[in-house]
Regions:
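Short loop/helix-cap segments at secondary-structure boundaries that form the rim of catalytic
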Residues: 29-33, 49-50, 71-72
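A short beta-strand-loop structural module common to alpha/beta enzyme folds
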Residues: 38-47
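Short, positively charged and aromatic/hydrophobic N-terminal segments
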Residues: 9-12
């Protein structure tokens, strides 16, 4: 039965193209787990939001990315995503430089923060826009741990200057692990199943 389900999905993918509007290797890996064939066509627009709350910023930017790519591929299903980190009401995006990465990691050390991933899935039959939030508790970090991690270069392309999959800084989380990585796989999978079943 599972093989039949996968076969049906592959047949639908031949008819209806699925596009991930992101260059993120982490999002590519997570979407691959859902067993859909897809293309990667990243958005290139400026990532500026007029929203006030971090969770709304993530949704607005995800919406903008998806719509930008959808305009060029109106017969496709397009997924746009954006991930932000919030601590004490303040937004942490990707660090501009190593100094800012250190500031972010120092601020997160020993505290609880939220990771919001906004997702927009666009198809000619409709738009699905949502944000998933995960609470993350950081361990207390020494300056050496922070500087050693920054020296790897890993923080520079990640919201909040860390990746949960490679830092070892997280004590525990409440919510979706995949969401912290940048792609709430379960919710996206539910929506795609609805779209491709029609």
């Amino acid at each position: 039965m599972q093989h039949l389900y996968k076969s049906i999905k592959l047949i639908y993918n031949i008819k209806m193209k699925l596009i991930l509007a992101s260059n993120s290797p982490r999002r590519k890996e997570l979407l691959s787990k859902l067993n859909y064939q897809f293309e990667i066509i990243p958005s290139v627009g400026e990532e500026v939001s007029t929203a006030k709350l971090p969770v709304d910023i993530a949704k607005e930017l995800a919406n903008r990315k998806a719509l930008e790519v959808f305009k060029a591929h109106p017969d496709a299903v397009v997924i746009g995503c954006d991930t932000v980190v919030e601590i004490d009401g303040q937004l942490l995006g990707k660090p501009a430089d190593e100094s800012q990465a250190k500031q972010m990691l120092t601020a997160l050390s020993g505290k609880t923060h939220q990771v919001h991933t906004g997702v927009c899935i666009v198809h000619k039959m409709g738009v699905w826009l949502f944000a998933d939030t995960t609470e993350v508790v950081f361990k207390s970090l020494s300056d050496k741990q922070i500087l050693d991690y920054i020296a790897t270069g890993s923080p520079m392309d990640k919201a909040g200057a860390y990746g949960i999959q490679d830092s070892g800084f997280v004590s525990h989380i409440v919510g979706s692990y995949d969401n912290v990585v940048g792609f709430p796989t379960e919710r996206v999978g539910q929506i795609l199943a609805t779209i491709f079943a029609k």
